[in-house]
């Protein structure tokens, strides 16, 4: 068996050059007293390593030279410059403009709604921000509000809660007065903001806790109706569960399952995403059976099913416009599709358009609510912005399909392979943003709210960060570090410069702006930038200085206490 293993797998031309000795070691031990199981394990490891290795078709079959041979020599100073340059690119993000005309129109529209981002050193902007932060005080000009908020992006964190389980979903509800968080322990928790007159008015305290009726592995998505009286969730069950929110009787909530297939009790299907329409009369969801379902909430029944809407799991759906006539969907086939409900009455359930350009599955899709632009977040580690007027042609769709089918890695436990940044032929996206990590779970990205002029795109990250991209510059405006595990979802407050995030470390965090942090927090081109978002920046952790009587101060001074004035003068 050892000879068969050797002849089948041990082709040294397939190994990476920088690790030849690792596999040559096997030739030294293959004739020793090793068990067949050891041989099989070694061969399997070689095959797995080959799958993750990029193809070097032009390499010589007998070239075992070091990678350093043939490379230009660099001085230590040049190496340091290269490291700093690559570090700057990694932190500031990368942007590729695919459609200059649409990108210019988008940026002009943003500039007309909020203007250029002012400097935080402007005293007038600080005064406006102070007035804006006062409860009961409002600035009537939306453009001024957007300028103020955009000049004071969140930069410090405040922990809301920590649970001993993974948190999957989080969002603001009831105009930002409450936060809802869904976790793997089959619970949905609500956090209420303290009253405006409270000393800690920016703090959120847990007010309610609901246990779901049925759950498979975890709650995968939650949705709250616009008026806040209905809640829906999806999990590994063949149903969407809907309940009426009544916080006065929160322990007696009744969940009504709406079956997907008319066969209750089956649980091999997953509902990855759930969304209410603006009128709260309908719910749309995407499933692991490649299908999209639309439900009537009042009648609690399924009114439309699009079978094989995608060629793989439907990871995300959303209503595109205020009338809830258009639906965006995204799946593991790497495509984003647009559906028009108005055409369904004629029996036409085909998409009205398709966007192609990703090299791997799409994890989330979001509408800019302007009936023109949308975004998609993908396992190819990019966010793409699309123009609704410019769909992809069939050649672009086929190119995307070929790229997705050529992927042989699993984002749930493997690192992203090289080559994902190469553009796809027929990509019609407006711009492509890169600078965050999409691993382990369906990480979500969204446009910032209307109060910011929808200038930013923010997303969770597998590195435990909240990454905020500026559409105007195409770079990272904020990289909020504070979690120790993947951030699956985050949400921007509808009217204030505040972001909430929940992660697999069980921590729910609210990010706000603090003027004291601007001394150490700056854009990534600042020469003194190091790290920010640390919890030490929060004044809630500062220890208060206790008052001491005069006799105690004299005693400490005579004993040479390290905090006494005499001790300080001696040092």
Curated annotation (Swiss-Prot):
| Biological process annotations from GO | cellular detoxification; determination of adult lifespan; negative regulation of cellular response to manganese ion; negative regulation of transcription by RNA polymerase II; positive regulation of multicellular organism growth; proteasome-mediated ubiquitin-dependent protein catabolic process; regulation of cellular response to stress
Q: Does the keyword Repeat apply?
A: yes
**PROSITE patterns, alphabetically?**
WD_REPEATS_2, WD_REPEATS_REGION
Q: What domain of life does the native source organism fall in?
A: Eukaryota
Question: According to the record, where are the WD repeats?
Answer: 162-201, 266-305, 309-349, 357-396, 435-479, 482-521
Cellular component terms per the entry's GO annotation: axon; Cul4-RING E3 ubiquitin ligase complex; cytoplasm; mitochondrial outer membrane; mitochondrion; neuronal cell body; nucleus; striated muscle dense body
Q: Does the keyword Repeat apply?
A: yes
Q: Which GO terms describe its molecular function?
A: RNA polymerase II-specific DNA-binding transcription factor binding
What residue spans carry the Acidic residues bias annotation? 60-69
Under the heading SMART domains, the entry gives:
WD40
Name the phenotypic consequences of knocking out this gene: Increased lifespan. RNAi-mediated knockdown significantly prevents Mn(2+)-induced dopaminergic CEP neuron degeneration. RNAi-mediated knockdown increases tatn-1 expression and enzymatic activity.
| Sequence segments annotated as region (Disordered) | 51-75
Q: Which UniProt keywords apply?
A: Repeat, WD repeat
Gene3D superfamilies to which the protein is assigned, alphabetical? YVTN repeat-like/Quinoprotein amine dehydrogenase
InterPro entries linked to this entry? DCAF, DCAF11/LEC14B, WD40/YVTN_repeat-like_dom_sf, WD40_repeat_dom_sf, WD40_rpt
Give one Pfam family, short name only.
WD40
As for family, the record states:
Belongs to the WD repeat LEC14B family.
| Annotated PANTHER family | DDB1- AND CUL4-ASSOCIATED FACTOR 11 (PTHR19847:SF7)
Query: Its function?
Result: Involved in regulation of lifespan. Required for dopaminergic CEP neuron degeneration in response to Mn(2+). Inhibits the skn-1-mediated up-regulation of tatn-1.
Q: What is this protein called?
A: DDB1- and CUL4-associated factor 11 homolog
Tell me the classification of the organism that encodes this protein: Eukaryota, Metazoa, Ecdysozoa, Nematoda, Chromadorea
Q: Which gene encodes it?
A: wdr-23
């Amino acid at each position: 068996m050892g000879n068969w293993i050797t002849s089948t797998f041990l082709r040294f031309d397939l190994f990476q050059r920088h690790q030849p000795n690792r596999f040559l070691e096997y030739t030294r031990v293959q004739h020793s007293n090793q068990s067949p199981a050891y041989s099989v394990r070694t061969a399997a490891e070689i095959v797995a390593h080959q799958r993750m290795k990029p193809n070097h078709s032009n390499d010589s079959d007998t070239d075992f030279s070091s990678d350093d041979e043939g490379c230009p020599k660099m001085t230590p100073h040049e190496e340091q410059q290269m490291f700093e340059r690559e570090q700057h690119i990694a932190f500031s993000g990368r942007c590729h403009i695919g459609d200059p005309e649409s990108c210019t129109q988008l940026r002009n529209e943003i500039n007309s709604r909020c203007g250029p981002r002012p400097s935080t050193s402007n005293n007038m902007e600080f005064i406006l921000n102070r007035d804006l932060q006062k409860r009961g005080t409002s600035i009537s000009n939306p453009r001024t509000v957007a300028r103020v908020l955009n000049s004071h992006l969140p930069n410090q964190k405040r922990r809301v809660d920590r649970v001993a389980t993974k948190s999957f979903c989080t969002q603001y509800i009831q105009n930002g007065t409450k936060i809802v968080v869904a976790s793997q322990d089959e619970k949905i928790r609500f956090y209420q903001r303290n009253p405006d007159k409270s000393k800690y008015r920016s703090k959120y305290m847990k007010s309610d806790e609901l246990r779901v009726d049925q759950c498979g592995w975890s709650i995968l998505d939650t949705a709250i109706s616009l008026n806040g009286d209905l809640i829906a969730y999806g999990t590994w069950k063949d149903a969407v569960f809907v309940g009426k929110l009544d916080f006065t009787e929160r322990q007696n909530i009744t969940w009504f399952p709406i079956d997907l297939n008319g066969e209750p009790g089956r649980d091999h299907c997953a509902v990855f995403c759930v969304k209410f329409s603006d009128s709260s009369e309908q719910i749309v969801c995407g499933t692991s059976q490649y299908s999209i379902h639309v439900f009537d909430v009042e009648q609690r029944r399924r009114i439309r099913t699009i079978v094989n809407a995608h060629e793989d799991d439907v990871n995300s759906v959303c209503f595109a416009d205020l009338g809830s006539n258009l639906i965006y969907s995204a799946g593991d086939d790497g495509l984003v599709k647009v559906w028009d409900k108005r055409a369904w009455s004629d029996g036409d359930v085909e998409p009205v358009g398709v966007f192609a350009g990703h090299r791997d599955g799409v994890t989330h899709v979001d509408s800019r609510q302007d009936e023109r632009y949308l975004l998609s977040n993908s396992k190819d580690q990019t966010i793409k912005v699309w123009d609704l007027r410019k769909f992809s042609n069939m050649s672009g769709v086929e190119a995307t399909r070929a790229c997705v089918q050529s992927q042989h890695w699993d984002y749930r436990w493997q690192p992203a392979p090289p080559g994902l940044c190469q553009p796809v032929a027929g990509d019609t996206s407006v711009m492509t943003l890169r600078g965050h990590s999409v691993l382990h779970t369906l990480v979500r990205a969204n446009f910032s709210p209307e109060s910011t002029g929808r200038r930013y795109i923010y997303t969770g990250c597998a590195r435990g960060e909240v990454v905020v991209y500026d559409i105007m510059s195409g770079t990272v405006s904020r990289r909020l570090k504070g979690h120790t595990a993947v951030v699956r979802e985050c949400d921007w407050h509808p009217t204030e410069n505040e972001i909430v995030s929940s992660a697999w470390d069980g921590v729910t965090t609210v990010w706000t702006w603090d003027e004291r942090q601007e001394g150490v927090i700056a854009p990534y081109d600042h020469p003194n930038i190091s790290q920010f978002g640390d919890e030490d920046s929060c004044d809630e952790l500062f220890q208060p200085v206790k008052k001491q009587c005069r006799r105690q101060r004299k005693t400490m001074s005579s004993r040479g206490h390290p905090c006494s004035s005499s001790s300080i003068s001696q040092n």
